[in-house]
């Protein structure tokens, strides 16, 4: 049996929902080479027919039944997509009818609700949070009064991508502070952070993994030396423990998992956008 399986994320909007759910499902299966393709804004019959033809062609090319993860809200478009002969995984259909019965109300199909700019205030909050994260990245700005969270870690431990994810997906004003050699020498919380203890969250990382990351940025330097990485990580972890700062290792942890842990630990209640 071929291990190659074509998978299509089809949506009448951005395709983010279909791809996110589809990716989560596919990660439950090992030993397969999933060839994925996102088809966004499939919002009329002609586009749906073209999408169905692409899926069918992929099935013929690989001699295997394709998979379509579908988040189109229009049932007619879903019916056209099914003509591809693919295994259809409908993101919404299994849940809409039970909800209609429970709420005693019909759905109002609207394209792009999940990731469109339906609520301007919410969208504005996301943009402001993103601007905040960028302007408070790597200690650029040190005015933390408006921050919801301040990530603290040695250089290249995952602070920046986590802050950006928190801003984009939760509207969290996330700043980050890089621990310098001077900070680590004292093994005490840097003075500029002491008034914000309740907002602090420490990130740590396996020294060997940190060295790999730093080598990509500045190879064969003191910054990326194995001893430097071991010393910085060990000192930062002692500081976090001494100052009772909640911590999490980013070594084998996804940005999504890190973000969820930060939110739950600090008690930040935000809906995902």
UniProtKB/Swiss-Prot annotation:
Keyword Cell inner membrane part of the UniProt annotation: no
Positions bound to ADP: 153-160
UniProt KW keywords: Kinase, Nucleotide-binding, Serine/threonine-protein kinase, Transferase
GO molecular function: ADP binding; ATP binding; phosphotransferase activity, phosphate group as acceptor; protein serine/threonine kinase activity
The protein's Enzyme Commission number: 2.7.11.33, 2.7.4.28
EC top class, as a word: transferase
InterPro entries the record matches: Kinase-pyrophosphorylase (IPR005177), PSRP (IPR026530)
Record's keyword annotation contains Protease: no
Catalytic activity, reaction form: [pyruvate, water dikinase] + ADP = [pyruvate, water dikinase]-phosphate + AMP + H(+); [pyruvate, water dikinase]-phosphate + phosphate + H(+) = [pyruvate, water dikinase] + diphosphate
Summary of the function given for this chain in its UniProt record: Bifunctional serine/threonine kinase and phosphorylase involved in the regulation of the phosphoenolpyruvate synthase (PEPS) by catalyzing its phosphorylation/dephosphorylation.
PANTHER family documented for this protein: PYRUVATE, PHOSPHATE DIKINASE REGULATORY PROTEIN 1, CHLOROPLASTIC
Entries under HAMAP family matching the protein: PSRP (MF_01062)
Family: Belongs to the pyruvate, phosphate/water dikinase regulatory protein family. PSRP subfamily.
Name the UniProt record assigns to this protein: Putative phosphoenolpyruvate synthase regulatory protein
Provenance organism: Xanthomonas campestris pv. campestris (strain ATCC 33913 / DSM 3586 / NCPPB 528 / LMG 568 / P 25)
């Amino acid at each position: 049996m071929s291990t190659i399986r074509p998978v299509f994320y089809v949506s009448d909007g951005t395709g983010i929902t279909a791809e996110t759910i589809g990716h989560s499902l596919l990660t439950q299966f090992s030993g397969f080479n999933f060839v994925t393709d996102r088809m966004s804004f499939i919002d009329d019959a002609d586009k749906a027919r073209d999408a169905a033809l692409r899926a069918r062609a992929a099935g013929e090319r690989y001699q295997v039944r394709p998979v379509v993860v579908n988040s189109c809200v229009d049932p007619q478009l879903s019916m056209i997509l099914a003509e591809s002969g693919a295994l259809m995984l409908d993101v919404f259909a299994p849940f809409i009818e039970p909800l209609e019965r429970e709420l005693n109300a019909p759905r109002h199909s609207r394209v792009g609700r999940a990731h469109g700019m339906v609520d301007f205030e919410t969208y504005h909050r996301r943009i402001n949070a993103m601007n905040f994260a960028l302007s408070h990245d790597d200690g650029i700005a040190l005015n933390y009064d408006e921050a919801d969270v301040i990530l603290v870690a040695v250089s290249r431990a995952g602070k920046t991508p986590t802050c950006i994810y928190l801003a984009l997906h939760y509207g969290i004003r996330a700043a980050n502070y890089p621990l310098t050699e001077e900070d680590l020498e004292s093994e005490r919380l840097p003075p500029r952070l002491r008034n914000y203890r309740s907002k602090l969250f420490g990130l740590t990382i396996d020294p060997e993994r940190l060295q790999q990351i730093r080598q990509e940025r500045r190879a064969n330097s003191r910054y990326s030396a194995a001893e430097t990485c071991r010393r910085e990580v060990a000192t930062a972890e002692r500081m976090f423990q001494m100052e009772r700062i909640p911590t999490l290792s980013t070594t084998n942890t996804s940005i999504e998992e890190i973000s969820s842990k930060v939110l739950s630990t600090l008690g930040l209640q935000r809906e995902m956008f």
